[in-house]
Amino acid sequence: MVRFAHTVFAMPFALIGFFLGIKAAGGFDWLLLLEVVLCMVFARNTAMGFNRWLDRDIDAMNPRTSSREIPAGKISPRNAMIFIVVNIILFIATTFFINRLVFYLSPIALAVVMFYSYTKRFTPLCHFVLGCGLALAPIGAYLAVTGEFAVLPVVYSLMVLTWVSGFDVIYSLQDADFDSGKGLHSIPQWLGIKGALRLSAAVHVLTALLVFVAGYLQGAGLMFAIGSGIFCVLLARQHSIVKADDLSKVNVAFGTFNGVASCVFAAFDIVDILFGNANFI
């Protein structure tokens, strides 16, 4: 029901936020790192579990998703809801041991990631709500360490928002006809496949600009430049392999390219945060 492989989209940026916080506040804490990782897992479980539970009837009608666990009868709706509630409790309980601000904000974070599942019922901007949910990763991890807001992690969050929204538009191309037939909303259903691809590309141009802004504010060095270069190349590459008349590589663009891009970027960026000392951007 929950694809842990998709955690690679947000988890690397949570780690970036964590190490930005460490650099700002000082003092590495293994227990705090574990708590941040657990929060990411519990939030992901809640969001994805709730999406599967809420969309179970829709998924049953869609040939692409009819084999998912709930419509296929492998997991009952009741057991899925128990899984969701347990992860909500674990998420909030874990934030209690981090700091007061994160604990107080935890219900809001859960509300955002769960609200996404409703949005395709009434707005084609649902992809941007998903982006907002994953964008909580870097700022949330930063708050876990420092207990206060700052501009740089917010820029990273905006970067995640645009990046995720753009590739989710590409992913949803597969369901454009189904969405139209069932009265569901998405960018492809609204703008058509060609229009959706153009919008996704424009949003990813904004992502690339935000990468540059983050590097500038961070006083980033060579490692960041290498990581961000690879990230942007992979970002562009996914747009070159998905065509309006050929959607066969959507899953490669969605999963492989973006998963590799986030992990590579985070690895280089974290090294730069911890050990870089010469401005490059």
Locate each region found by the language model:
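Intramembrane alpha-helical segments
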Residues: 1, 38, 68-155, 236-243, ...
